[in-house]
């Protein structure tokens, strides 16, 4: 499954299991900044700038509908995310318990926002959303360590302080809600002017 800049989610279907896609099928369209994709218990989750959706039993649906132009039913997971497109791409990942993790980038290069969702990595479950990491300018990827299960994530450094300053980061979350410095400090010890 692939999120395209054209606002579509595409299923690449390998019917003969040779590692190459035999068919390409649009399964969602007219999305804004379609990006993050995660599969859990057979359901496909995907994001756009202010929403997260799921399609239930995606593999079964594809097997029954690969040759027609129908679109599967999308189920809204949340539409309570900021709509700013600056750092608006959302990346998704489920943990082993099925809780969905996603990023919300800062809506600017350097700023403070009253909306606590910005500049963070969040987790959503039946009880709502919760902070996993704060002070994260813009993560473009994260995953869980296979043994420790700790979350590791990237964070893109701020702009306009120099060619290579501050560095982008690879961080580890040790406690929920941990603060990683943005907008005050970058790359461990670079203070914001």
Which positions does each model-derived feature cover?
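Residue-level detector of Asp-centered blade-edge/turn motifs that repeat once per structural unit
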Residues: 39-42, 94-97, 144-148
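Asp-box/WD-like beta-propeller blade repeats and closely related beta-sheet repeat scaffolds
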Residues: 23-24, 33, 38-40, 50-95, ...
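Short loop/turn segments immediately following beta-strands, especially the blade-tip
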Residues: 12-19, 55-68, 174-180
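Residue position within the beta-strands of beta-propeller blades
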Residues: 1-3, 46-47, 101-104, 150-155
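Blade-loop segments of beta-propeller domains
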Residues: 5, 10-42
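A detector of repeated loop/turn-to-beta-strand junctions in beta-rich toroidal repeat architectures
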Residues: 6, 21, 49, 115-118, ...
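A short loop-to-beta-strand structural motif that recurs across blades of beta-propeller domains
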Residues: 8-11, 43, 51-53, 120-122, ...
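Beta-propeller domain segments
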Residues: 89, 106-110, 116-119, 123-130, ...
């Amino acid at each position: 499954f692939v999120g395209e800049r054209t606002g579509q989610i595409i299923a690449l279907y390998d019917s003969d299991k040779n590692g190459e896609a035999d068919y390409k099928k649009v399964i969602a369209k007219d999305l804004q900044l379609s990006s993050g994709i995660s599969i859990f218990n057979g359901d496909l989750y995907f994001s756009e700038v202010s929403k997260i959706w799921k399609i239930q039993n995606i593999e079964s649906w594809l097997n029954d509908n690969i040759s027609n132009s129908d679109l599967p039913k999308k189920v809204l997971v949340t539409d309570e995310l900021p709509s700013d497109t600056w750092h608006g791409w959302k990346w998704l990942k489920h943990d082993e318990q099925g809780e969905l993790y996603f990023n919300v980038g800062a809506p600017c290069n350097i700023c403070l926002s009253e909306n606590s969702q910005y500049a963070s990595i969040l987790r959503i479950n039946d009880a709502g959303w919760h902070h996993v990491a704060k002070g994260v300018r813009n993560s473009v990827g994260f995953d869980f360590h296979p043994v420790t299960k700790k979350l590791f994530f990237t964070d893109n450094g701020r702009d306009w302080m120099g060619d290579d300053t501050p560095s982008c980061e690879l961080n580890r979350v040790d406690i929920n809600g941990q603060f990683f410095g943005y907008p005050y400090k970058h790359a461990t010890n670079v203070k914001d002017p």
